[in-house]
């Protein structure tokens, strides 16, 4: 079974934002939904899917797909971080972008493999 943790709360935690601090929730939700749309285009997750608050979980998006869970969580975290709070260092930004490209490749590869199989 995929993770039943709230998508919003896990991304906030990874961004270093306390779960009870809601000042940026609407901005973060918008960026999460943008990223989920990218994942939809890759063939990952349930389609169409978006979050409206803290109720939606990773299991809601991925179902029982444990294989993609950590890849997707890391991808969403990094993508939201790059939009919401980009690093000041160009070296860190480049490292994040390279990681995002690698994650995109891996996620698309898994989705293509499952389609063929």
Regions found by a protein language model. Name each.
Residues 1-68, 105-117:
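Conserved short "hinge" loops at termini or chain/domain junctions
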Residues 61-117:
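Short loop/turn elements at secondary-structure junctions
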């Amino acid at each position: 079974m995929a993770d039943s943790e709230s998508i919003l709360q896990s991304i906030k935690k990874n961004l270093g934002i306390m779960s009870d601090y809601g000042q940026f929730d609407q901005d973060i939700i918008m960026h999460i939904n943008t990223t989920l749309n990218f994942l939809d285009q890759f063939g990952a997750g349930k389609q169409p899917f978006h979050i409206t608050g803290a109720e939606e979980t990773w299991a809601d998006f991925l179902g029982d797909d444990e294989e993609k869970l950590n890849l997707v969580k890391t991808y969403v975290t990094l993508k939201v971080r790059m939009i919401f709070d980009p690093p000041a260092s160009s070296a860190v930004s480049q490292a994040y972008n390279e990681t995002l490209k690698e994650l995109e490749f891996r996620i698309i590869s898994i989705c293509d493999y499952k389609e063929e199989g």
